Design a protein with these regions (language model features):
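Short secondary-structure boundary/capping segments
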Residues: 1, 40-43, 87-89
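Short beta-strand/turn micro-motifs composed of small residues
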Residues: 13, 36, 99
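Flexible, glycine-rich phosphate/dinucleotide-binding loops
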Residues: 18, 41, 60
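Glycine-rich FAD pyrophosphate-binding loop
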Residues: 26-46
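Beta1/beta-strand and adjacent pyrophosphate-binding region of the FAD-binding site
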Residues: 2-17, 33
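Dinucleotide-binding Rossmann-like beta1-alpha1 core, especially the glycine-rich loop
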Residues: 50-116
């Protein structure tokens, strides 16, 4: 195997996940090729800007993992902005989850995880 193929990566799909993977490999000196059928078919055109693991119905360890991952995003976005000289537009603005009554609130999966 030649040096060129040893450090080459092919990624199928140019959505948010595919491009994120490509970015990380590229930062680590891999030659990256992304193949994408149609860019506007990716999930990024639907909800890529929504970072709300606490509103996804996750519980216990999966919720904690999601929250920890979400907390890494600002630093990651900053590295993308520095590498590209393009602002990504990340804004922390919260989320509103309305409830009809206190019982519904208490049944919400993240209600009992106030320390997260």
């Amino acid at each position: 195997m030649t040096q060129e193929t040893k450090n080459s990566i092919l990624i199928i799909g140019g959505g948010l996940v595919g491009l994120s993977i490509a970015y990380e490999f590229s930062r680590n000196n891999f030659k990256v090729l992304v193949l994408s059928k149609n860019r506007n078919e990716s999930a990024g055109f639907v909800a890529a800007g929504m970072l709300a693991t606490h509103a996804e119905g996750l519980e216990n360890e999966l919720l904690k993992f999601g929250q920890a991952s979400q907390n890494l995003i600002p630093k990651w976005i900053k590295s993308i902005e520095q590498d590209s000289n393009i602002k990504c537009g990340l804004k922390k603005c919260g989320i509103v989850v309305p409830f009809k009554n206190k019982e519904d609130l208490e049944e919400f999966p993240t209600y009992k995880y106030e320390d997260i």
